């Protein structure tokens, strides 16, 4: 069963890569007990590729858990505030650095 969090970004967007990296780092810090599946570069033929490639700003698809994994879903449901803070920290770090 798939487990962990991952961040998908446009493979030709340096700013998207940086944003995905900052988000991944904030999630790894906030949830050390969860598995990081890392960053995934998308192209136009990948599922989600159109979304991250057709925007006019850096875009990242954040997947904190797999919907098919009830244990991970329940974990993040019980830690919504920490989840929101991890998103905010990652975005803030991207904006100021």
Cite the ranges covered by each PLM segment:
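Short beta-strand elements
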Residues: 35-39
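A short, glycine/acidic-enriched catalytic loop
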Residues: 1-30
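Structured segments of extracytoplasmic/periplasmic soluble domains
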Residues: 22-33, 90-97
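Active-site-adjacent mobile loop/cap segments within catalytic or ligand-binding domains
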Residues: 40-97
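Solvent-exposed loop/turn segments at secondary-structure junctions
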Residues: 1, 12-15, 33-34, 44-48, ...
